[in-house]
Amino acid sequence: MSTAGKVIKCKAAVLWELKKPFSIEEVEVAPPKAHEVRIKMVAAGICRSDEHVVSGNLVTPLPVILGHEAAGIVESVGEGVTTVKPGDKVIPLFTPQCGKCRICKNPESNYCLKNDLGNPRGTLQDGTRRFTCSGKPIHHFVGVSTFSQYTVVDENAVAKIDAASPLEKVCLIGCGFSTGYGSAVKVAKVTPGSTCAVFGLGGVGLSVVMGCKAAGAARIIAVDINKDKFAKAKELGATECINPQDYKKPIQEVLKEMTDGGVDFSFEVIGRLDTMMASLLCCHEACGTSVIVGVPPDSQNLSINPMLLLTGRTWKGAIFGGFKSKESVPKLVADFMAKKFSLDALITNILPFEKINEGFDLLRSGKSIRTVLTF
């Protein structure tokens, strides 16, 4: 029996309070309005950005259904939807691509003005919500809310992908892989023969390593305080791995000594102000580029000496690896299907959706790279 046009009751992981476990609740998911799409979720990755919300470092309205890295199948569409249809395999896009705003029309940028990232309302683009739990409205997260068996997104925030793609793997293209890989190949534009430093070896950091290798970097120095991640980093392309706790001097000084004055490209993939500064300082003062990839704590500022940039350094950041989401995600999935890169090494744990709290515990303890939840 078709569910199109009807309210669907399903299970979702609701965050009612900060620093508390998720609660698996029965929620009602309203049908999609015009230019919206309702998706049956198949697989969702647990990303550090979701944990930043739980810990209070990333602010979004509560109660909320988190999750933003996922893949699923279109259940139904609202009036006027033309780019996807029921039955299509899709990836929701936490960075939409409306194609009409100033940012979308700029070939060098991807931070579409329809996003709900910078000053989140916790709604879809029309300012309303599609989730309720026992009659209480529940907020959306960055327009996608993938920790639910069903979700509703705007049409400009979903991409149709190859019908043969394995959703439990390509879900990582919805955030972690694309964010890291694109930061190297598209944002920094790593050059052949260059030297790179990558701070943080989670799923996104390892994807940066993969991007540096694909771009032809000669040296890729991986930096993390968890030595258990070094073997995986080397498997994916790191030429050296170092632990800042093994040195008495600041890690940026160690890296400068290792690289004749500094690396060509550095990446901060943790979200800490101290490592952002170390990443900037370790790149060469005359020609280095440092990229902020990790999500920084809310409402905290860095103070720097402008001379660090005057000498020739470049300091930049990007969301989603600089990729324009709706047009790039299908291409990235096609590249995966053509075996241009593998995602297997990034997925360390697969758990049923109901064990979401266990998955977050694995992330917090550093025992997982990516945990994928299956529905």
From Swiss-Prot:
It comes from the Eukaryota. GO terms for biological process: retinoic acid metabolic process; retinol metabolic process. InterPro entries: ADH-like_C, ADH-like_N, ADH_Zn_CS, GroES-like_sf, NAD(P)-bd_dom_sf, PKS_ER. Its cofactor is Zn(2+). It is an enzyme of class 1 (oxidoreductase). The modification N-acetylserine is found at S2. Belongs to the zinc-containing alcohol dehydrogenase family. This is Alcohol dehydrogenase 1C. The gene is ADH1C.
